[in-house]
């Protein structure tokens, strides 16, 4: 579907009762949204998982990290480099089911014969669908200043009626070296807008519809044959065509990356990243008085408006030190802080009974349900979510044969009780590249052979921030402390003053290999994970609680398994096997 989101999976089991999502890091900006990018602006995608992910990005990396690097400017000697690409596609209706004809339906006496011959599945197909993509990039730069900017337009039509998405946007990546290379500034701005027209035609219903009925009626006002009071048979074509749906997604993301090279101490620098992301969603819907739902409910039109906004703020600052010592020793150390904050708000309104259909949702206050006190309205502000951490990590290698790394993070989350917000997490890994040993020099067919072992402890706070907020709600029956019910405004959440971090302990043993000048390569891993203090919403009695559930730390889970990947220049095979068991207490 044109409106389908991007789904990414990293093969890990992290929680028993929910799915953790991977953190997206775009050009060093954690918490990015891959849907804000176009594939032509992506330079590379890398994946981190297990201990390596937690060591760098902390608890938000519980399910792994997807690192995305976008294209940037280069030294073109001041000349402008222009690149244009396009793509045109048409989708086919594959795997269409075989439908009964009107004559076959009538012969089986399944239902009333209305005299038509309609393939309802085929009627929902947009046979004239056409999709196109255009991408224009401009690049120029010198040794000290480089700029990359791009613009794109995409129109994607699905095979279903009223299924379309149009995207356009652009981005600017720049890099400037100042003060004799003491300071490097890398600003970036990204904007994307996606307009959606999605009615999600009911193909399942199309397979149940009576094929002797026609979707069209030339004598009706709309040209469609609309009937009601038959729950198992209705005009799916009219439902899709008569509803007005317009959704608009907007992403705006400016960020600045500052790197200060401290020249009196070679190899030492300080880097500061500040980023802001604003995502807005607007939805406009209108069902006219001729729509089946309005006829069935004796209404004259239904208008719906919705708006939501999410703001992400990220700030990271860290010192890094890189030094190559005599004898093949190498050290890479980093220490700093990380801050992440999320805010959001939303609004929605429904109104009914309009004097005319043509104005649709643009004058939503004119529906009679508003003056009658029956219109639906809602608004809200999400609980502010904050994550703050201090971290340090070090990597050591000797002659690219022996490798050690260690990290520690002191992390605090606003999602937990005040006494349990801060926790310490750490990891350590070791590696041995056997292929670089002197006794392996005679094995010419061996390119790389490395054994690695790692152990790490990370936390998880992947749940709604509302569980630790004193949320209030209205228009609801509340259980009072004395055991009686009252229709009032009151607490909608049972706060747990003892809620704490979910903690994952993991060790991993793996082998990486490459043979015959890279023609055959792969890896093998054995892992074992134990998750303690699992976070789960459990049922609680009323009273003394005002609500029937509360988020608690309830138990533990253990998983272990094997995974392997074998690849050649043309083919790749992957196999995994894992066993998981849990215990609660």
Q: Residues of each region from the PLM?
A:
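Extracellular/periplasmic, surface-exposed regions of secreted and cell-surface proteins
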Residues: 21-23, 173-179, 188-193, 201-204, ...
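Flexible glycine/acidic-rich beta-alpha junction loops that bind and position SAM and/or redox cofactors
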Residues: 197
